[in-house]
């Protein structure tokens, strides 16, 4: 069998030499007649869109998991760095972590195996309690060992790639950090009552300021009682416009035009303030008589 395989004959089952193999490789004929067809079929094959989508989803999921793993390792590293920055003692006469005095007058101390610093028993961790001679580690060295164990650095002989979390802006995105909801404060009833009183007072002031002089004069004229010395005067007759005049009877005294300017009405209101009837009415003030047949009476508008 071996002679048949390694013989120099031209049998088709004999392995060709290197020259023939190189020639067949250039001609893409392969080892047998079926080799070229298999290669051709392999080249013509292509993936369907569904298969391509599934492959892309697997790749994207692997990338997301990789990013999550890097963020997890970054949180471990940040915690370790924070502990290293918050040391308060020198590790010789004081505890490395809390800064408590050590010695005869202070707390009892233990010696960390990794960093060779002294810490108190509260800040130290006993790594091997079953041994005759206990092994102590400080919290920083114990956390560093935990980081190497949980990140896989012991396998890679170094810390893998990690992503540190953001400082202050990133705390809001942390699922473990949520700001307390602030309840809206209800308005006090006292403040609402004060605002209502203020609105009422303001409306009264505005409404009093919006009255015109003509309204005041017309109301005062209608409420004024009839003079005792005049008879037959038409006081019940409705007034017209502010510029109109009232006619006097033939047998009674004549009256001047009833329209007055704004200054005269204001002057009359100031002078008539003192001659007010206790019952609420205003008394007329007659003008001095002039020599003649007719007597005129001045009407004061308020």
Swiss-Prot record:
The protein's assembly and partners: Recruited to dense-core vesicles through specific interaction with RAB27A in endocrine cells. Interacts with RAB3A, RAB3B, RAB3C and RAB3D. Interacts with ZYX.
Subcellular location: Cytoplasm; Cytoplasmic vesicle, Secretory vesicle membrane
Entry comment, domain topic: The N-terminus of the RabBD domain is necessary and sufficient for interaction with RAB27A.
Matching Pfam families: FYVE_2
Organism classification: Eukaryota, Metazoa, Chordata, Craniata, Vertebrata
Name listed for the protein in its UniProt record: Rab effector Noc2
Major location category of this protein: cytoplasm
Keyword Cell inner membrane listed: no
Residues binding Zn(2+) 2: 112, 115, 138, 141
Function field: Rab GTPase effector involved in the late steps of regulated exocytosis, both in endocrine and exocrine cells. Regulates the exocytosis of dense-core vesicles in neuroendocrine cells through interaction with RAB27A. Acts as a potential RAB3B effector protein in epithelial cells.
Tissue specificity of this protein: Highly expressed in pancreatic islets and parotid. High to moderate expression in adrenal gland, pituitary gland and ovary.
CDD domains: FYVE_RPH3L
Cross-referenced InterPro entries: FYVE_2, Noc2_FYVE, Rab_BD, Rabphilin/DOC2/Noc2, Znf_FYVE-rel, Znf_FYVE_PHD, Znf_RING/FYVE/PHD
GO biological process: calcium-dependent activation of synaptic vesicle fusion; G protein-coupled receptor signaling pathway; glucose homeostasis; intracellular protein transport; negative regulation of G protein-coupled receptor signaling pathway; positive regulation of calcium ion-dependent exocytosis; positive regulation of insulin secretion; positive regulation of protein secretion
